[in-house]
């Protein structure tokens, strides 16, 4: 889905950027994943019934 595409591009940018594997501490990969997943899931959980979310997973 869209969230996976965004996450993959973010990870590729972090790994393949000018700094190579040097990732700024304020933008660690776990934090990026947490922020992206929360940004994607929070509105879905609030707006859609649990059954719809189960189908998406």
From Swiss-Prot:
The keyword Secreted applies. Its main location: secreted. Transmembrane segments: none annotated. It is found in: Secreted. It comes from the Eukaryota. One of its GO terms (molecular function) is hormone activity. Keywords: Hormone, Secreted. One of its GO terms (cellular component) is extracellular region. Residues 1-26 are annotated as: Disordered. Somatostatin inhibits the release of somatotropin. Belongs to the somatostatin family. This is Somatostatin-2. It comes from Piaractus mesopotamicus. The gene is sst2.
């Amino acid at each position: 889905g869209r969230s996976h595409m965004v996450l993959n591009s973010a990870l590729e940018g972090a790994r393949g950027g000018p700094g190579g594997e040097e990732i700024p501490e304020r933008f660690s990969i776990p934090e990026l994943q947490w922020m992206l997943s929360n940004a994607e899931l929070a509105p879905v959980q609030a707006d859609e019934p649990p059954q719809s979310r189960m189908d998406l997973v």
